Amino acid sequence: MKLRLLTATAGIAVATAMLVSPAAMADEALVKAKGCTACHANEKKLVGPAYKEVAKKYKGDAGAAAKLAEKVVKGGQGVWGPIPMPPNKVTDDEAKKMVAYILAM
């Protein structure tokens, strides 16, 4: 009985981990296509902060999505260290999608 429960629980955990919405996959592809991964990664700091660090820092901040989308478009500096993030050639809609993807981590 315990073995069945353990097997079922493990199976559910694996299946849940494998479920990624098509929208999230598209937003991840957008982040890669726009070159963001040259400076950022999901789990570790490269030139800029890890996406998970960004999500953690802005968790619960109702204005974070708009603030970060503007930084993606216009660039920014001083929040994560001395190296500035340059402006990016993305539309406002693309920036919002990318930020939503990052904040969902």
Predicted feature descriptions by range:
Residues M25-N42:
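Sequence/structural segment immediately N-terminal to covalent heme-attachment motifs in c-type
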Residues M1-G11:
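Bacterial N-terminal signal peptides that target proteins for export
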Residues A38, V47-Y58, E70-Y101:
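Axial heme c-ligation environment in periplasmic c-type cytochrome domains
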Residues A29, Y101-M105:
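Short hydrophobic/aromatic patches at helix-to-coil boundaries
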